[in-house]
């Protein structure tokens, strides 16, 4: 994959439910704590090195931000870092929360 793909929240939810992809949430800590997708990893400048060490780059990665804009830059960055299959979630957490309000966790993990 030379370029990331943009996917809808329904496709992201299906991939996550089937264990087909890792979900990375790039929103700020306060927003993440207020609500995030269960199982999402909070990706920050501080957690990025650990992700790079622990992830083989082969498992697909989905990037989520607030509305689907910032995730595009992060997805492109991850591709340049050697991740093979990267997706940006269209509409971000805002779209996820509207589509799947029952699938929102609170607090940090």
UniProtKB/Swiss-Prot annotation:
Source domain of life: Bacteria
InterPro entries (alphabetical): GlpE_sulfurtransferase, Rhodanese-like_dom, Rhodanese-like_dom_sf, Thiosulf_sulfurTrfase, Thiosulphate_STrfase_CS
Coiled coil: none
The entry's keywords: Cytoplasm, Transferase
GO cellular component annotations of the record: cytoplasm
Class of this enzyme: transferase
KW Cytoplasm (keyword) present: yes
Reaction catalyzed: thiosulfate + hydrogen cyanide = thiocyanate + sulfite + 2 H(+); thiosulfate + [thioredoxin]-dithiol = [thioredoxin]-disulfide + hydrogen sulfide + sulfite + 2 H(+)
PROSITE patterns given in the database record: RHODANESE_1 (PS00380), RHODANESE_3 (PS50206)
The keyword Transferase belongs to this UniProt entry's keyword annotation: yes
Domain Rhodanese: 17-105
Pfam family, one: Rhodanese
Signal sequence, start to end: none
GO BP annotations listed: glycerol metabolic process
Any one GO molecular-function label of the UniProt entry: thiosulfate-cyanide sulfurtransferase activity
Location(s) in or outside the cell: Cytoplasm
Active site: 65 (cysteine persulfide intermediate)
EC number(s) from the headed UniProt entry: 2.8.1.1
Function comment: Transferase that catalyzes the transfer of sulfur from thiosulfate to thiophilic acceptors such as cyanide or dithiols. May function in a CysM-independent thiosulfate assimilation pathway by catalyzing the conversion of thiosulfate to sulfite, which can then be used for L-cysteine biosynthesis.
Similarity comment: family membership: Belongs to the GlpE family.
The protein's name: Thiosulfate sulfurtransferase GlpE
Source organism of this protein record: Edwardsiella ictaluri (strain 93-146)
Gene designation: glpE
